[in-house]
């Protein structure tokens, strides 16, 4: 017997269609094709050949046996199995999406780091390829340089010996180059002693030098022999120096080439060092990125494990359904019936005993019910009923009404210079508006709680925007409050200005009285003008001190507005007539110059005549 598994309303149902012909007046309606024997199951015998049917055309309608006369309907057994649906937790799904995005970013970052690392390693290998021949070339120049140095060493030693024999040591006298030179020096010292008149101390010194020169005779002879030997083997001193110069020139060329190669090697070595440093940095970065990626992998694995744990009953139910299908294919009705009864009893016991199980199952079938336009209890949904799962609104359109109204309802930020408290009626208006907003929010929260879907949280729905009339009324109230605040500020400023003007007038009157008293006292005592000049800076100091005292209470307040001052200039001291001094008249010197010139001319004329 075939068992068909069909999905219906969260259950696995095996429908039982009736394939026999309906009865008419208590009898079966027999027709053509009903005379074939009916077997259990959906598979029957194959039809006979067309030739045999043509031979038996006459007796085709006549029944032959009871099975053909009374056909038995095809029997189909129906078994009901509970079906568990998979459930995707939105929190776990969001975490998985976020973890997948993070893993994708880390994979991209890792591939980028790997590409950079490959490029740097290729650059390092290129630098190694350039450095290896240069190092081998420098090694060849080093060997050449060492060979030339070895060739020059005997010549330099010979020159050193020749030079060391010429000069003497710091302690003793100079060693002569030959025995003839030594004899001539000794003879010159002896000649001085014999033929020159010198003091005794100098004579003793000369005798001492002669003895020292005689002591160097053996060395002079040995040096002369060695010099002769060197000349025989290597030639004269000039020839040796020429050879050394030639070899030194070749050595300098080798040295320059070696220095150029060394500079190139140093440059490449610096580049190689920088490349190695970059490679180490990239390797560390790759290590950190790999660690982060491994953590992301482990996080995704944990989240998937949590998701599978929540759907463990779904996987168990799937194995049960597969087993039922296998039993149905095998036509093992007894075991299939036992399995169905056991599963149903298990489900009913869990449904009646555990609340969490009921909530979880209802949560799992909500999507199926909603897709089939059914309500929570399985009946057809009415047109006015809301869907079980609210559709997610677009992020651009899902802006709440508060975000549209609150910025308009907020008053403009007042400047810091005017922190004047608003009057009481304005405060009450603001409180009323705040209370109204709170009431609206509480109402919205209550509505959200009522509309919450069991097992899925609150459905997302758009809040109703505030009407234009209410927004206009709120703006009007705000403008009235602002106007009242401005009037209060103006009144306070006017009162402050009047008080300051009264204080200033009183101080000026006191100053005038003091000045008049001082003038009267000076007239009586006959004071000098110096005292009068000293009074002017004192008055100016008092004028400066007065505004400072007035500004002190202003500093305590935040309001800083420059008050309008009506300064009245105080009368200064009476002007005294200046004393007119008699000045001497400037003498004109040209008046004396003319007679002086005449006198000089007369004297010259008289002298001229006197000489003649």
Curated annotation (Swiss-Prot):
Identify the coding gene.
PPI1
- What organism is the protein native to? Arabidopsis thaliana
Taxonomic placement:
Eukaryota, Viridiplantae, Streptophyta, Embryophyta, Tracheophyta
Quick one: a GO biological-process term for this protein?
regulation of proton transport
Residue ranges annotated as compositionally biased, kind Acidic residues, are 531-545
In the record, the note on similarity to other proteins reads: Belongs to the plant Proton pump-interactor protein family.
Mostly located where? membrane
TM segment ranges? 591-611
Q: What does this protein do?
A: Promotes AHA1 plasma membrane ATPase activity by binding to a site different from the 14-3-3 binding site.
Put simply, this protein is called Proton pump-interactor 1
Q: Which residues form a coiled coil?
A: 90-113, 251-314, 466-526
Residues annotated as carrying Phosphoserine in the record are 540
Tissue specificity statement from the Swiss-Prot or TrEMBL entry: Strongly expressed in root and shoot vascular systems, particularly in meristematic and sink tissues. Also present in pollen, stigmas and siliques, but not in developing embryos.
